[in-house]
Amino acid sequence: MILMNNPGDKEVLRLLKQRMESVSQVEETVKEIIRRVKEEGDRALEEFLKRFEKHPVGIENLRVTEKEISEAQVEEEFVETIKIVIEDLKEFHRRQEERSFFFTTKGGSFLGEMVVPLESVGIYVPGGKVPYFSTLLMCAVPAIVAGVERIAVTTPPNENGGISPYILKTCEILGLKEIYRMGGAHAVAALTYGTETVKPVDKIVGPGGVFVTLAKKHVYGDVGIDSIAGPSEIAIVTDGSADLDLIAADFLSQAEHDENAMSVVITTSKEVFEKLPQVIERHLEALPEERRKTARISTENFGTIILTDSLKRAFEISNLIAPEHLEVLVENPFEPLGHIKNAGSVFLGKYTCESVGDYGAGPNHVLPTFRSARFSSGLRVSDFTKKIFITHLSEEDFRRKSELYSKMARWEGFEAHARAIDVRREKL
């Protein structure tokens, strides 16, 4: 664990750079995987399926059958819970819907902006170790609200080559039938470029580990992506009024996700700074073995506690980190809202642990990481739509404005543009 007493911006940025460098070590491998899947299709994909998946998957059983989906067995309570959460998520995401608009100018021209859903989207659902059905919900619900026609789901198989029944049942409830058992960079490449078996999509959304995050970064431009949603992050700003057990529990809630996850506590309390490491250790020991192992590595490498002399400085550091998740555990959690500039999602007060955001409080949990919250946002309905401009110029407006447009074209040096306008003026 890293302890920092009143660090400057350079020290904080150095810490963040170290984490990014640890991730970028696999970048060349990712590029090679993408290149080969793009050029060789199924042949390369099958090789990577056998090399990287926990259970070797052949091309012939890459896609999950409808029979497998319908036969997925889960508790009835799970089904009822998922249905409740879907409605809660829809209630929030419907408020994000953007409307087309059209209007007529004084001269009779018809102008507007048409909001159109994307035709196809690929959802990457992390898997293998645990069934991230919550991520499936967070990605699929806004896509459904937006009206996306084709939604493909890809998730790594477990050690038996199967997909978690919780994932399959969630797909069935959502009405999703196109499901692939593949993960990693090769899954991203297959959805981007297509293969003989996998049909390409227009956009890929969903978080993943290092390989997935870097793969999405490299295919962007050939396909749309949501954001750089990689290994999890949390920053907790506290003035010392919060219970140490709450802080420690929330710290580890992200550390258990991934060995490259980053948990940071920024506090104005010397007591928190000095005592929290021991409390975190106690909570760490209480975790199941596999989660404890992951959380310990993450905590040792990237777990950080920072002491500052004021809440103002605490939020300056938080804005510098631009965390995926930001918890505000202070006496009056609404008061500092004006200081928050960079964060994927903000959780206010002692009852709003980040975990409730993971499982359906309303806002999406697919969020920007690696400081990309400085310029991007969490997944939302508009990520699944595009805007198409509509123009119909009336004869009156053309007569009145065409000479101006013709002159502008010539000032820019585009004679053919000007002539396209002039030839119409000559025929009036």
Swiss-Prot record:
One of its GO terms (molecular function) is histidinol dehydrogenase activity. GO terms for cellular component: cytoplasm; cytosol. Substrate binds at residues 232, 254, 257, 325, 358, 412, 417. Belongs to the histidinol dehydrogenase family. Its cofactor is Zn(2+). Its EC number is 1.1.1.23. One of its GO terms (biological process) is L-histidine biosynthetic process. Catalyzes the sequential NAD-dependent oxidations of L-histidinol to L-histidinaldehyde and then to L-histidine. PROSITE patterns: HISOL_DEHYDROGENASE. Pfam families: Histidinol_dh. Keywords: Amino-acid biosynthesis, Histidine biosynthesis, Metal-binding, NAD, Oxidoreductase, Zinc. This is Histidinol dehydrogenase. CDD domains: Histidinol_dh. The active site is at residues 324-325. Zn(2+) binds at residues 254, 257, 358, 417. Pathway: Amino-acid biosynthesis; L-histidine biosynthesis; L-histidine from 5-phospho-alpha-D-ribose 1-diphosphate: step 9/9. Binds 1 zinc ion per subunit. InterPro entries: Ald_DH/histidinol_DH, Histidinol_DH_CS, Histidinol_DH_monofunct, Hstdl_DH. The keyword Transferase does not apply. SUPFAM superfamilies: ALDH-like. It catalyses: L-histidinol + 2 NAD(+) + H2O = L-histidine + 2 NADH + 3 H(+).
